[in-house]
């Protein structure tokens, strides 16, 4: 049997509440797996996997990143993290959930799984906060030619400058 727990915590953006979920197995927990989801996803998309792993004694947990799933703020802007230093804020939200889990379930091996956009967040996370993690799964990741990345970043900056930080970018998506 696996028990689903939903809860909220304060985002590091200082304004928003983050929706998080734990799928907690009955009995002894052998491992905690934190899922860091991809672009245009939400953590409950991983529920079938979480239920399966829960039956094997693995607690699965994760949060909806800012602008995703049930963590979409009052502005209703899907996919928009925040205005100030979004990459750092999202990584710090992932870290906050890890700390909460380790405080509530101390001494249990901890693994983090990053999929797609979540793989980039996870790699950034591991660079900043890798201690206390016994394993990492990076899947659906990728790399692009430097010139293409620079071009996309330039387009994003121009759109942000003229259209505002919360504007939905045209031509830059999945």
Regions found by a protein language model. Name each.
Residues 1-27:
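N-terminal cap/lid segment of alpha/beta-hydrolase-fold proteins
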Residues 37-41:
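Active-site glycine-rich loops that stabilize anionic/oxyanionic intermediates
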Residues 48-76:
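Conserved alpha/beta-hydrolase
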Residues 64, 111, 135-137:
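Residue in the alpha/beta-hydrolase core beta-strand immediately N-terminal to the catalytic nucleophile
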Residues 82-102:
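Alpha/beta-hydrolase active-site loop
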Residues 104-116:
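Alpha/beta-hydrolase fold nucleophile elbow
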Residues 114-124:
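Glycine-rich nucleophile elbow surrounding the catalytic serine of serine-hydrolase chemistry
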Residues 122-174:
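Alpha/beta-hydrolase-fold enzymes
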